[in-house]
Every structure is written in structure tokens, then in C-alpha cells.
Amino acid sequence: MVETFSFAHLAYLVFESVLQVVIIALAGFWSASSGLLPKQSQKIISLLNVDLFTPCLIFSKLAKSLSMAKIFEIAIIPIFFGLTTGISFISGKIMSRILDLDKDETNFVVANSVFGNSNSLPVSLTLSLAYTLPNLTWDQIPNDNRDNVASRGILYLLIFQQIGQMLRWSWGYNKLMKWSGENTQHMPPSQVQSLLERTPNIDNEELVNEEQEEQELLEEENNRMNSSFLSSSSIGDKIWQKSCTVFERIRANLNPPLYSMIFAVVVAAIGPLQRELFMEDGFINNTFAEAVTQLGSVSIPLILVVLGSNLYPSAEVFPKTVHHSKLLIGSIIGRMILPSCFLLPIIAIAVKYINVSILDDPIFLVVGFLLTVSPPAIQLTQITQLNEFFEAEMADILFWGYAVLSLPVSIIVVSGAIYVLQWANPT
């Protein structure tokens, strides 16, 4: 049975959880402002967290509570990712059209709209809310508890995060957050110079490409004539090379958190190993499992400290473009406001009327609502720095998204999620 609470009471509970997260992030902001945590140290701590502490958190939470039945149920998450990405893309395009932005500015607003934070802030809030909010246990799981709720929330976020990260560093890095060269007005001098250096070579490259095409046609003709003499060993070599290429591409997209999730799935699939690690009060449980759990407990505070330190203004001043305010407004509305107008009703109706897979899990509803309104990903700062792409605008967007809007928006949205849960399950 779902216990009913007033909106004011729910808002107060959410406020407590969000404020806890904000206070830890403020510690990181203070550390950066006092010089205790300079940029280089932030990068080292962030790397240590991603490669060590976060994988331990993922393994300790998932391997303990996962089962094969749950693993099959999460197939809906890529569908949810596609839906949210599509609507966010449309939202970014709408804002760009309203604000009359050019191609590069439009790509920037679209990138900020599409690539929301699914790592630091949502993970911290989900863990905090899992132990604070009422009615988050799932009636389909016998003896469900808050530890299991937190574990499932992390699992949903992790899958969303991994898909988003691959998209950010492919489509985002190579297309959306890179100068097209169509309008050099906004481009920094170094990028303009690079564009000018590339331009004279275009005609030569076309001539070279034509010669290469002719050569390739001749080679193809020769290959056809000699195809009957192709040995089985050469076919085997080609298959082996193809397999190695595919394996390398897969390995390039793997990272420590993803490895950790894979190991957690393996442990969950082997019942005796899972019991020995987490349920039997034996040597392995009291040593290895406890050590991993303690390492994982460091992850969330470190994530928030680094998040807070990243929000401290850099000593380096980047020039603002002519449409600085337009880009700021378009990115914030396109990321945190406009998509929620479409997505939140869709999620609410799906939870009410489609009792399929994890749609019935209360923590999935909370995670879905949080992801819909989460600020732009901190990782976008790295991409804009690498491509020298609207760096001043990116810094201001992150400040407004995290320091100003995250607290009130999170309170309203999570309180709304619990209200939707009460509406969807009145008895």
C-alpha cells in the first residue's frame, strides 16, 4: 500500500536530501577557491574516482542485489534513452529556431540539450533519496529494502550513463561541439588559423582522391581476375583481422565502471559466488567484499567535491560571443525545462497504464524524472576546451544549471515523481 503525503512534506524531505548534496559540493567549491584543490588536482582526483572508487561502488551495490531476472528487465532503458535523447534534440532545435541562431550556435544548444548529467548529481541524489523518501520499495521483490532500492537506482543510471558517454565522445565531440567553419565570427583566432591552413589543401585532396579511386578500380579488377586463386588460409586471415578489429573497437568503449558492471553481472549469475561474497559471514565476505564496499563509500563524496570544485570560476578568462545570453538561455531551457514538458507526462502515463518491466519500479520513476531535468554534463567542459568551442558560454551554463537551478528544480521534480507514484498506485 502506498502511504500518502502532502506535497509540502515531500518537498521538505527532498529539500533535506538535495541540501545534503549541495553542502558537500560547496566543500569542493571552497577547496578550489582557497587553492587547496587546483585544476590539476581536480583531474587527478576525478581520474582516481572513475578508475577506482566508482567501480567499487558499482560492484558492491550491483553484485549484491542483482539477479538474472532483473538483468533481463532493464532492456527498456535503451528505449527510454532514445526517447529522452530524441525529445531533447527537438527541444534544442526549437530553442535555436526561436532565438535565430546560426549553425555552430544551434549545434552548441542542441549538445547541451541532449547531453544531460547522468553521473555526479543524479547518482548522489538517487542514493540520498533512496534512504529518505517513502514508498520506494518495489512490491514485486520480496523483502525489498532501501539498500536494494539504491542498488537498482545506480544500475539504471549506470546504463544510461554509458550510452550517453559513448554518444558524447562520438557525435558530440566530432560533430555538435566542433566548429563547422561556416561562420568565423565566433571562432577563436587559433581555430580560424587552423581553418585557413586546411582550406588550400581541399582542391589537392580532391585530385588525390580521384587518383586513388582510379587506382582502387584497377586493383578491384585485378582482384576479380585472381579471385579463383584465393586460398582458404587468406580467408581465415581476413576473418581473424576482422574479428580483431571488432574486438578493439569494443575494448575502446570499455571503461572501469563498465568492467565493474560486467563483473557484477557475472557474480549475480553465479549464485554460490554471490552468496559467498555477500551473504555468508565468511572469510571472503569479511575481507574482500568489505574492502570493496569501503572503497565504494568514498565515491559519492569525491564526486560531489570534484563537482563543486569544477564550478569555481577559472582564472583564465574566455571571450564571450555576441549571442552569449541567447546561448545561455537556449541551453538551459532546452536542457532543464522544455524536454520535461513533453517527457514528464509521458513517463507518468507509462507508469500508470503500462506495468511492463521496470516501469513499475518506484526508483525508476524518480531516476527518470531526475534525468529529464538534470543540468548539462560536466564532461562537456572538456569537449569545449579541446575544441575551443564556446568556452565562456559553457562555463556560465554550468554555473546557472548547478549553482542556481539544480536545487529548486530537483525539489519540484522529485516531489512530483512521488505524487505521480501516489496517483499511479492509489491503493
From Swiss-Prot:
Disulfide bonds: none annotated. The keyword Transmembrane helix applies. It is found in: Membrane. The modification Phosphoserine is found at S234. Present with 6440 molecules/cell in log phase SD medium. Keywords: Membrane, Phosphoprotein, Transmembrane, Transmembrane helix, Transport. Pfam families: Mem_trans. One of its GO terms (cellular component) is membrane. The lineage of its organism: Eukaryota, Fungi, Dikarya, Ascomycota, Saccharomycotina. It comes from Saccharomyces cerevisiae (strain ATCC 204508 / S288c). Belongs to the auxin efflux carrier (TC 2.A.69) family. The modification Phosphothreonine is found at T199. This is Uncharacterized transporter YBR287W. Its main location: membrane. One of its GO terms (biological process) is transmembrane transport. It is a multi-pass membrane protein. The chain crosses the membrane at residues 10-30, 43-63, 71-91, 253-273, 288-308, 327-347, 358-378, 397-417. The keyword Kinase does not apply.
